[in-house]
UniProtKB/Swiss-Prot annotation:
GO cellular component: mitochondrial inner membrane
Note accompanying the cofactor annotation: Binds 2 heme b groups non-covalently.
Record gene name: MT-CYB
Cofactor requirements of the protein: heme b
Stated family: Belongs to the cytochrome b family.
UniProt miscellaneous comment: Heme 1 (or BL or b562) is low-potential and absorbs at about 562 nm, and heme 2 (or BH or b566) is high-potential and absorbs at about 566 nm.
Protein name as it appears in the record: Cytochrome b
Localisation: Mitochondrion inner membrane
Membrane topology listed for this record: Multi-pass membrane protein
Keywords annotated in UniProt: Electron transport, Heme, Iron, Membrane, Metal-binding, Mitochondrion, Mitochondrion inner membrane, Respiratory chain, Transmembrane, Transmembrane helix, Transport, Ubiquinone
GO terms, biological process: mitochondrial electron transport, ubiquinol to cytochrome c
Subunit structure: The cytochrome bc1 complex contains 11 subunits: 3 respiratory subunits (MT-CYB, CYC1 and UQCRFS1), 2 core proteins (UQCRC1 and UQCRC2) and 6 low-molecular weight proteins (UQCRH/QCR6, UQCRB/QCR7, UQCRQ/QCR8, UQCR10/QCR9, UQCR11/QCR10 and a cleavage product of UQCRFS1). This cytochrome bc1 complex then forms a dimer.
Species per Swiss-Prot/TrEMBL record: Tomopeas ravum (Blunt-eared bat)
Amino acid sequence: MTNIRKSHPLLKIVNDALIDLPAPSNISSWWNFGSLLGICLTIQILTGLFLAMHYTSDTTTAFNSVTHICRDVNYGWLLRYLHANGASMFFICLYLHVGRGLYYGSYTYTETWNMGIILLFAVMATAFMGYVLPWGQMSFWGATVITNLLSAIPYVGTDLVEWIWGGFSVDKATLT
């Protein structure tokens, strides 16, 4: 008599993916970070969508909208903290994932490694845009301090900063 997890059509899919996964026996917990990245990204997207439903970007009402989210929205404080700490966890998992790849020599697979580097740069650019463009309390700081890092590039740094800003300086606390 066969086990139900191996004979039932739906349970067979779960069994083959989770229980009887054809993985080497020496696989360690270092290989979990890709899955953790997916979970963190899903949490970021969902909490970001729910937070965006209640957030206003005007300089006079942005702080009040964050206060409204934390006090009046059901579990709004939890959404805010999950979103803030989820970003940190995402990057911790990302750097550990890259570190694991360096440790185990995954850079020898050049096509895969180069695609990962492209994804890393895309994630960092997206995180920067997500930090600067929500048009919230930290936008002014994010736009000035992070982009001023480009001014360290010799000869063209200051021109790059002015080009990214679209002028000499960023104006208000929010970008509206």
